[in-house]
A protein has these predicted regions:
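Non-catalytic accessory segments flanking enzymatic or RNA/DNA-binding domains
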Residues: 1-17, 23-144
Length: 144
């Protein structure tokens, strides 16, 4: 396992798209002097950065634009929610202070939606497992 930072980057020339990038060290979060430069908008630290990349890919695989540049078609609040709602242990290190209340509200709403969906899916699979365990016990007892 390799510790690292997962960060989200946006670019004014690519609205509605986000890049998920990784580094071993904390990325530079100073705002770009040129408004046409990419900007870091969110940083999280993971104890297993490769697993974090895999989880992002699994969550947003339908929105992947370019695997080489790690570019996805997603809003910034949705992209941040993908990271925040993941069950992997992580720590939010930095959040762009220029984010508005509306974007933060959308992120929180998306986090709740993703966590509820994951919880419901877990319950479904636990129910399926219990059903098959019960059928196995009935089969062993010769009742089924």
């Amino acid at each position: 396992m390799k510790t690292g930072y997962l960060y989200l980057q946006t670019h004014p020339d690519h609205p509605g798209m986000v890049r998920f990038l990784t580094r071993d060290t904390l990325p530079d979060t100073d705002p770009a002097s040129d408004s046409h430069e990419p900007a870091v908008r969110y940083v999280a630290r993971f104890s297993d950065i490769e697993a974090a990349q895999m989880h992002v890919q699994n969550s947003l695989h339908h929105q992947l634009i370019d695997i080489d540049t790690h570019m996805y078609r997603a809003s910034l609040p949705e992209a941040m929610a993908v990271v925040e709602s993941d069950d992997l242990k992580h720590e939010r290190v930095w959040l762009d202070p220029a984010l508005g209340e509306q974007e933060l509200g959308l992120m929180e709403q998306s986090i709740r939606t993703r966590r509820n969906r994951s919880r419901n899916l877990d319950r479904l699979w636990q129910g399926v497992g219990l059903l098959f365990a019960a059928l196995l016990v009935l089969r062993m007892l010769g009742l089924f």
